[in-house]
Each structure stands twice: as C-alpha cells, then as structure tokens.
Amino acid sequence: GHTADSVSLVLDDAVLTGDTILGAGSTVLDGKDGDLGDYLASLDRLQQLGEGRVALPGHGPDQPDTAVLARAYRAHREQRLDQVRAALDVLGPDATPMKVVRHVYADVDKTLWPAARMSVKAQLTYLRG
C-alpha cells in the first residue's frame, strides 16, 4: 500500500509495521507505486490481528497496540477520502492533485504540500478507479 514493496511482519506479541504504521504522524502514500486500496487492505489485516500486539514502526517510537492504531489510521484515511470527495464536488471531477491539496490542506504548512500531493494523487486514483 504505502509502496508496492511495503510489508509488515507479525511476531508473537508485536508487529514490525515498517512504514505502514509510523510511530508518529501518518504515512504518505508514494505517488509512483503506492496504492490506497492495498494500503487500506493492509490496515484491515493489521486490525484483524486483534488487540495487544505492540507496533514496531520503521520510524518513530513503538506504539502499544497495532490493531488500535491500524483502526485509527483507517479512520484518518476515510476522513481524508471524504474531504477529497467534497473538494471534487467544489472543484469538479477532473481537478488536479495540487488543486485538491490547496483545497483540503489549506490549513496545513505548505512545506508539507508535496507529501500531501503524493497522497492526494493516490486518493484520486482510488476514487476514479
């Protein structure tokens, strides 16, 4: 999901989440080969592991519960998808990723817009099928 070669490894009481779930913040979907459908499916699989496994991310601090965090990451992605859908209602169905970023991320530091653009590109690909 995050990238085409992104994996998580399940251990007895922990999950090495790589970049699928980070220790802080949210994962950027790579604009070249990241796939939102695959990413959401990965989050669903991590939720299905059940609560109680520590998340050991590729970046940032360990997190106490992989399933709880996967659920929160999925909710965040669904919220962003709703925001992108709303932006397309205003901007039109053919809006470019950058136009959507300007609309959805207007309150976010502009230095983060390139990363946001990559995620929006993946979201638009997902929504446009």
Task: Map each language-model feature to its residues.
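C-terminal regulatory/interaction regions
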Residues: 86-129
